[in-house]
Amino acid sequence: MNFILSRGYYFLFLLVNILEDGIMVKQDDLVRMIQEIISATARAILNKKKIRQQDLDEYDLLTQQMLGFPVKELATMDVQELIDRYANEEDRIGKIELASVYLLRFSEEVEEDILLKSKLRQDGIRLLKYVQQEDTNFSIQRDCLIRMLETNQ
């Protein structure tokens, strides 16, 4: 796990564990496509292969379709606004969890603005905690990730 963290790819590790453990299992094609892309990307990272920008772009597009807005907007959204956005949706927990991981990914990509980096990371952790508290299924992987992120600040 330290290798993944040191490379800034813990968001992929989290998503693969979430998706493979069935926490976000859905029957629609969009989620299955996201699962395939995330799994392929995570395998590439773990095998020390370079991730193609085309794969990341495709993942971004699918995530945008799933969340219902451009993923870059996550950086400017308030955590409560995001939670409220999906309050009445059946798959709200999955969408909030996906958004939280994306915020963590963005925090790893930001280098020049330390305040933005910190905000994105904190928002991602807050959303993960919310998901852990509100989800009907307890996730050991999610709990470990939250603890690791809080310790690694």
Pin down the residues of each PLM region.
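Short coil/turn connectors between adjacent alpha-helices in alpha-solenoid helical repeat scaffolds
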Residues: I45-L56, S107-K119
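A conserved position within tetratricopeptide repeats
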Residues: I45, T63-L67, V71, S107-E111, ...
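Mid-chain, well-packed structural core segment of small domains
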Residues: R92-D113
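Short, Lys/Arg-enriched N-terminal segments with co-localized hydrophobic residues
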Residues: F3-I23
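"A position-specific structural signal for the A-helix of alpha-solenoid helical repeats
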Residues: Q35, L98-R105, C144-M148
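Amphipathic alpha-helical binding modules
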Residues: D113-Q153
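N-terminal alpha-helical interaction modules that lie
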Residues: V16-I96, T151-Q153
